[in-house]
Structure formats: structure tokens, C-alpha cells
Design a protein with these regions (language model features):
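N-terminal single-pass transmembrane signal-anchor helix
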Residues: 1-36, 42-49
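Hydrophobic alpha-helical segments involved in membrane association or supramolecular assembly
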Residues: 24-32, 56-57, 79, 99-100, ...
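Structured segments of extracytoplasmic/periplasmic soluble domains
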Residues: 37, 53-57, 147-154
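Residue-level signal for alpha-helical context at structural boundaries
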Residues: 41, 49, 68, 162-163
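Amphipathic, membrane-active segments
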Residues: 43-64
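Short, glycine/small-hydrophobic-rich surface segments
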Residues: 57-91
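Intrinsically disordered, low-complexity regions enriched in Pro/Ser/Thr/Gly and acidic residues
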Residues: 87-215
């Protein structure tokens, strides 16, 4: 009788331990999922606030000469960096703490020559988001695109580029803000979730660059 009871107790104990193990794995998985959702939500808030802060002072930002002007330090000193964004004093760029992605806010000048030999120069403000290949590339891209869409009335365009390890070169596309929106181009205000999914699928496991442009 004792052997039977002891044997049964052992089996029951192993069963309990197995249940605890399953519950522990489930709890860890649930916690990881909740943490990822939290980080993505915080990332979305930080990106949106950065865009709003930059657009609110864009007409006051200094830019002169032919070189690129960076505003990272200015935003840092003016206390205009949202929670979750830090200024890297060694490199000079901005870094978001959630997924360690790099950001530069700058005024860029690019000279061009058209087919007729006419020359000119485009002056454009850019918030440049760079994120290396990762498992969350799609979600990070989606946050940035949605933030750009919310500010479509005040931006020139959103440029997206992905660098594939399997395909040569880059894939680049432009989605335009309200200023340049027309029937012949893709417009931010018209993007739906399917459009964003198609666009950001290029960032799944690939290095991606998104540039939010203003004039």
C-alpha cells in the first residue's frame, strides 16, 4: 500500500511539475509579448513627438552654405527630444532606446543636372530613420509611416529604402504629403493598412532607411 501511494505521489508530483513548467513557459512568452507591445507603443509615441517638435520649429532652424546642417545637438540642447531618444555625443546622432535605431535630423542640399543641362539645387529638411535588419523591422517601419501619415499636411514626402541581402541594390519609393499629392503619385493621406503592410514588408529582416522630408 505504501509503495502504491508513494508511486502515485511521485507521478502526481511529476505531473504538477510539468504543469508548472508549462505555465512558466506560457508566462514568459506572455511577458515577452507584452513587453514588445509596450516598446512598440513607446516607440510610436517618441517618433510622433519628434516629428511634431521638428515641424513646429522648422522655419526657425538655421541653415546656410552648401554643406549638410545637422540639428541633433540643437534639439538635444533645446530639450526637444522626447522620452526614449538620446543624443550620442561621440557619434553626434540620435538613438532611440527601444530598438537601438539611429536617427538624424538635418538640412540637406543636393545639386542636380537635368537632361537639358539645366542645373539646380534642392534644399530639403530630413528626419532620417535608420534601422538594421531585425525581427521587428516591419513594426518599426509601420510606426514611422503612421506618424508621417498623421503629419501629411505639413511634410513634403516620405522616402523609404531597403537594402536586401538577397537582392542587389536598393528598393526606394516615395509617398507624398498633401503639398505634392495628386492622382499620379502615392499619397500619405490615402494610405490604408494594406498599403502600409506592403510597404513595410520590405523591412522584414532587411536594413531599412526612412526619410521624412520637409521644405
Amino acid at each position: 500500500m505504501m509503495i502504491s501511494e508513494n508511486g502515485r505521489s511521485m507521478v502526481e508530483m511529476l505531473g504538477v511539475l510539468a504543469i508548472i513548467g508549462v505555465l512558466s513557459v506560457g508566462a514568459i512568452a506572455g511577458y515577452s509579448k507584452a513587453m514588445m507591445k509596450y516598446k512598440l507603443n513607446q516607440h510610436a509615441v517618441a517618433v510622433n513627438m519628434l516629428i511634431n517638435n521638428v515641424l513646429s520649429i522648422k522655419d526657425k532652424l538655421p541653415h546656410s552654405g552648401d554643406d549638410t546642417t545637422y540639428y541633433n545637438y540643437l534639439l538635444y540642447k533645446a530639450n526637444l527630444l522626447p522620452d526614449g531618444l538620446n543624443y550620442n555625443k561621440k557619434i553626434g546622432n540620435l538613438e532611440e532606446i527601444y530598438f537601438k535605431n539611429k536617427i538624424n535630423v538635418m538640412w540637406s542640399r543636393s545639386k542636380w543636372t537635368d537632361a537639358n543641362g539645366n542645373q539646380g539645387q534642392d534644399n530639403t529638411g530630413i528626419i532620417h530613420f535608420y534601422f538594421p535588419a531585425s525581427d521587428v523591422g516591419y513594426e518599426v517601419c509601420r510606426n514611422i509611416v503612421l506618424a508621417a501619415k498623421e503629419n501629411a499636411a505639413n511634410i513634403d514626402s516620405l522616402a523609404t529604402s531597403s537594402y536586401s541581402t538577397n537582392k542587389p541594390g536598393t528598393q526606394t519609393s516615395f509617398i507624398y504629403g498633401d503639398i505634392k499629392c495628386s492622382q499620379s503619385v502615392s499619397c500619405l493621406k490615402n494610405l490604408n493598412l494594406d498599403n502600409i503592410m506592403t510597404l513595410c514588408n520590405n523591412c522584414k529582416g532587411e536594413t531599412c532607411v526612412l526619410g521624412m522630408l520637409w521644405k
